Amino acid sequence: MNSSRRTLILRLWVASLCLLTSVAHAQDVAEIPDAVRENVELLVHKGLEDTVGYAFVRDLTTEVGPRLAGSEAEARARSWSTQKLAELGFANIRTEPFTIPYWSRRVDRGSIVSPAPQNMVITALGGSTSTPPGGVEAEVIRFESMRELRAASSDIVAGKIVFIDEKMTRTQDGSGYGMAVRKRRNCATTTSEKDGVACLIRSVGTQDRRFAHTGMMSRSAAVGDGPAAAVSPPDAEQLTRLLENGPVRIRLDIQVEAQSEAPSGNVIAEVVGRERPEEVVLLGCHLDSWDLGTGAVDDGAGCGIVVGAAHLILSLDEAPRRTIRIVLYGAEEVGVLGGHAYAKRHADEMDHHILAAESDFGADKIYRFDTRFGEGALPYARAIQQMLEPLGIAPGHNLAGGGPDISMLPEL
């Protein structure tokens, strides 16, 4: 079975079954009315053949491409999405604008100067400041972790380029990513505090290709506390080998553009509920991406999943009891700013948000079903789990975190 379609089906089941209103005890498995079961089975059957979700991400990445937060391309993505959602028949389509600090890379180059001159594949991290024009050259000091850097004295860091060579642990559920990004967020600040001149981190990820993975560092404005970049895994290995033989000098040239304010926005569309239209089941993804690729996986695939799932529900003969609201969040990559903006704008409506789900972790085989349901809703979690078993999806825990943007919502 196509993995993106498995993800689509999971979203459909959650969105469909969460519309139930009967009561059951926490240790029971909820009884699902026959009509709802039939709808679920129909949605699964359609979902296995449906191509709306795939077409959405294919066309988004082809016709718009990379969608850096605050850029003209992100604005085009909002216009493109509203048109697509209208063509698909959704209701109440609108954009909710907000402003963000804007950052973009202009130059990011790195090289080993001595003892073995050669280029390195690097990429500036989001929020990095610029180096002096032409770059900065200094001796490298290597640390195996952020903890090691924090424990180091300023005397050994001052005037040097810090290299954090911490590797990401490969895990099935991706939990190693959260640990790995700490160096990306904090390296520049800690380096600056210890009078280092720049920070270089081993690229976050478990692949070994000569490609550097970007992402956001901590900041309170358009830029952070110093120049910072990621280096590809093969170049990190090369740098480590050279350091084993003696001192190494490198050059980093990073030039960025930053503005205090730029436009962004959340795109919203709905399948209006037939009985309780004021009550909302939110399905979210983020529309922005970084600029080094097309944003197909992060998070074009997530937007394809939620749009495809909601469209299948829209195609049913009868509307759902509650409103299904799609939110294509803006500016997630640069600080979950769309999530903050939505939570602030809709603060008075949170009592009407019944459930939220987000797709922002790629599209691959679904192997486990985790939830975060209240005690009274746990029987429905168990019912959903039972219905997912034929797809090879195992029961999980009730401690799910949802996703970055919906994590900004108050407890539902």
Segments predicted by a language model, with ranges:
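Noncatalytic luminal/extracellular "stalk/propeptide" segments of secretory-pathway proteins
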Residues: 29-30, 36-39, 58, 62-173
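N-terminal capping segment at the start of a domain
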Residues: 31-71, 209-219, 288, 355, ...
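Short helix-loop-beta-strand segments that form the rim/entrance of peptidase-like active sites
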Residues: 55, 63, 312-337, 356
